[in-house]
Amino acid sequence: VAMIANRGRIVRPRLVLSRGERSVPVLQRSMPETTSNLTEEDWQKMVAAMEDVVHLGGQGFRRNGTAWAYIGQRIGYRMAGKSGTAQVVEIRQGEEYDEEELSEFSRKHAWFMAFAPVDDPQIALAVLVENGGGGSSVAAPVARKIIDSYLGRSVTMR
């Protein structure tokens, strides 16, 4: 997610072993490395599509962003996100089933990855709620609360 937020540049993480009082250098700053052959236009399209997941609303049934109804309203910054749902047990395509009848551990995993603010990314994250259900309805609100908190915004969602 951070690589998308940085439009193809990745900063290698460093491990901090100590932040004690000793005069030991804590971090050595990494320089971003470009690790992609995508063009700036490609990155802009990808980020715009991820913004729509959160912010595209009022378009009618099945035309809104998948997370708009859950997190895209009353948000004071631009967030880019991607929802996902991972099936845990095999259910054939087109097969009818009642998720409530499945054991809790057979229910779908809810995923949501996001970064914000879009124009100056400061946080990137991925949320997984095991056996939680839909990514937009379950994992996206968790991501929104974390990002709101990180950016110092009050968390007011419906």
Regions found by a protein language model. Name each.
Residues 40-41:
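A structural-propensity feature for long, helix-poor, extended segments
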